[in-house]
Regions:
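RNase H-like, metal-dependent nuclease domains and their acidic two-metal-ion catalytic environment used
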Residues: 1-134, 144, 159, 163, ...
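Surface-exposed loop and turn segments in beta-propeller and other repeat-based domains
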Residues: 137-138
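Surface-exposed intrinsically disordered loops and tails
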Residues: 143-153
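Amphipathic alpha-helical blocks and their helix-capping loop/short-beta junctions
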Residues: 153-159
Length: 231
């Protein structure tokens, strides 16, 4: 465990006082962008949230694996790669999701993520891809197995949806309901700031992992009441 004082910028989503308390550990396994902190455990419940990039050396395609069996929820693995092509990314998600007890996956589908979600669900036949049902002014409801035309694979990140996710993420982290010891995640949180009436990375920084956290916070709003208890 390494104590490193992460000093947040001005207007970070997470308070500077909280950021100062975060410490990081080395992963137990590291391979081609995948860092593992805890191996899969029998009877544990996991969810994976995914943020996809185009794979041309700009932003990173990223996902985070969360253990949601008990409070506090924990980051148990993360993947971050700025060269992986969108056509290949679903296979990596598929392998890790299966390993973590067929984890539910929630994919942000504003851009190329739509293709990733489709390949994972239709081509790789992975059934635990979460969907969103459109509910008019209520926005998007996250869940599985919706029927009807107004449902889609993954979550579409509108400004209202992102605002809700950011608010919930702030509560989770500052109330110690979500724990992470990943250096890259903590580093991104220190530069995830308010800009143009939303939260995003500071100029020259990345927020791919931070957005995976936001997607996770969104999923909890809808999913947890329906989550089956551990066997």
């Amino acid at each position: 465990e390494f104590e490193c004082e992460f000093l947040g910028s001005v207007d970070t989503l997470i308070s500077v006082s909280k950021l100062k308390t975060l410490v990081y550990n080395d992963p137990i396994k590291r391979n081609a962008g995948l860092d593992i902190y805890e191996n899969p455990k029998e009877d544990h419940n996991y969810i994976i949230t995914v943020d996809t990039a185009r794979g041309i050396d700009g932003d990173y395609s990223a996902f985070i694996v969360f253990d949601i069996t008990n409070f506090p929820y924990r980051v148990v693995a993360k993947y971050k790669n700025n060269e992986i092509k969108p056509m290949l990314f679903p296979s990596i998600i598929h392998d890790i999701a299966k390993a973590y007890n067929y984890a539910y996956t929630l994919i942000e589908v504003n851009d190329i993520g739509d293709q990733v979600a489709s390949i994972l669900f239709f081509d790789l036949e992975y059934e635990n891809v979460l969907m969103c049902a459109m509910r008019g002014r209520a926005g998007q409801i996250v869940g599985s197995g919706f029927s009807g035309k107004k449902s889609q694979l993954g979550v579409r990140m509108t400004s209202a949806v992102k605002k809700l996710g950011c608010s919930n993420l702030k509560t989770l982290l500052e109330d110690d309901k979500l724990m992470t010891v990943d250096y890259d995640i903590i580093a991104e949180l220190t530069t995830f700031v308010q800009r143009k009436n939303t939260f995003m990375a500071e100029e020259g920084c990345h927020d791919d992992l931070a957005m995976c956290l936001v997607i996770f916070a969104l999923s909890l709003i809808h999913l947890l009441p329906f989550r089956p208890p551990p066997l």
